[in-house]
């Protein structure tokens, strides 16, 4: 990457920003922590982390004007990566709460069903199975990598084509990642998933950098000669 991309890490009082920031910086990004919509719009890419409850996350995003800002940025083509709860809030609704989600992806967040011997929350390492091998997050990754999960709820996309990866907990297959154009999100924590997770973060950083470079080239091409 010729230019260091600026990645905005959304600070809205929900999420482990320290680990995500360290992981992104290790992969070549300049990271800005911000809860300001204008700062997010100036970045080359945005990472939306999150841990905790669905309604709390939605409330804090909306109270800060970040919900509408994120929707507008995604629709404008800005690369966006959701992590854990940051994936779930992208959907229409959740069994956990009563507030509507951001609605960027159609579908609902569901709770794992109880079954004998199954631990909920799902905590620990699990294997990824790619459903969409063309998702930019999987570049230079082999299928079957192991990543780290901490969650009781999972997303159930209304469109099968939005599912980028899946995993299995007990007898239940669930969506582990989604990908649609510039919008990507994962249920697991890439910043805690060793080399596989760091490669995923690097792929997102490079995706943001390539979009930024393309925009610079387009501006130069349309600039009138001196």
UniProtKB/Swiss-Prot annotation:
Disulfide bonds listed in the record: none
Entry protein name: Imidazole glycerol phosphate synthase subunit HisH
Keywords, in A-Z order: Amino-acid biosynthesis, Cytoplasm, Glutamine amidotransferase, Histidine biosynthesis, Hydrolase, Lyase
Quaternary organization: Heterodimer of HisH and HisF.
Cross-referenced PANTHER family: IMIDAZOLE GLYCEROL PHOSPHATE SYNTHASE SUBUNIT HISH
Keyword hit for Amino-acid biosynthesis: yes
NCBIfam families: IMP_synth_hisH
Keyword Signal: no
CDD domains: GATase1_IGP_Synthase (cd01748)
Localization: Cytoplasm
Domain of life of the source: Bacteria
One annotated GO biological process: L-histidine biosynthetic process
Active site positions, chain numbering: 84, 189, 191
Role this protein plays: IGPS catalyzes the conversion of PRFAR and glutamine to IGP, AICAR and glutamate. The HisH subunit catalyzes the hydrolysis of glutamine to glutamate and ammonia as part of the synthesis of IGP and AICAR. The resulting ammonia molecule is channeled to the active site of HisF.
Signal peptide positions on this chain: none
GO MF annotations in UniProt: glutaminase activity; imidazoleglycerol-phosphate synthase activity; lyase activity
Organism the protein comes from: Gloeobacter violaceus (strain ATCC 29082 / PCC 7421)
Family annotation (InterPro entries): Class_I_gatase-like, GATASE, Imidazole-glycPsynth_HisH
Principal cellular location given in the protein's record: cytoplasm
Enzyme Commission number(s): 4.3.2.10, 3.5.1.2
Catalytic activity: 5-[(5-phospho-1-deoxy-D-ribulos-1-ylimino)methylamino]-1-(5-phospho-beta-D-ribosyl)imidazole-4-carboxamide + L-glutamine = D-erythro-1-(imidazol-4-yl)glycerol 3-phosphate + 5-amino-1-(5-phospho-beta-D-ribosyl)imidazole-4-carboxamide + L-glutamate + H(+); L-glutamine + H2O = L-glutamate + NH4(+)
Pathway: Amino-acid biosynthesis; L-histidine biosynthesis; L-histidine from 5-phospho-alpha-D-ribose 1-diphosphate: step 5/9
GO-annotated cellular components: cytoplasm
Record domain Glutamine amidotransferase type-1: where: 6-214
């Amino acid at each position: 990457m010729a230019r260091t991309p600026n990645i905005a890490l959304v600070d809205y009082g929900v999420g482990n920003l320290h680990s995500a920031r360290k992981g992104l910086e290790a992969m070549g990004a300049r990271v800005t922590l911000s809860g300001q919509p204008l700062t997010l719009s100036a970045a080359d890419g945005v990472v939306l982390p999150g841990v905790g409850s669905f309604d709390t996350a939605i409330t804090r995003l909306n109270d800060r004007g970040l919900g509408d800002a994120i929707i507008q940025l995604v629709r404008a083509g800005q690369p966006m990566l959701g992590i854990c709860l940051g994936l779930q809030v992208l959907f229409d609704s959740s069994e956990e709460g009563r507030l509507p989600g951001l609605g960027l992806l159609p579908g609902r967040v569901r709770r794992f069903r109880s079954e004998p011997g199954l631990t909920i929350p799902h905590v620990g390492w699990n294997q990824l199975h790619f459903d969409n091998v063309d998702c930019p997050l999987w570049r230079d990754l082999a299928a079957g990598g192991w990543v780290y999960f901490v969650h009781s709820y999972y997303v159930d996309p209304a469109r099968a084509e939005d599912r980028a990866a899946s995993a299995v907990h007990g007898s239940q297959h669930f969506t582990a990642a989604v990908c649609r154009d510039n919008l990507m999100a994962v249920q697991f924590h890439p910043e805690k998933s060793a080399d596989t997770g760091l490669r995923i973060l690097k792929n997102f950083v490079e995706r943001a950098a390539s979009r930024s470079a393309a925009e610079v080239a387009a501006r130069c091409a349309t600039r009138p000669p001196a």
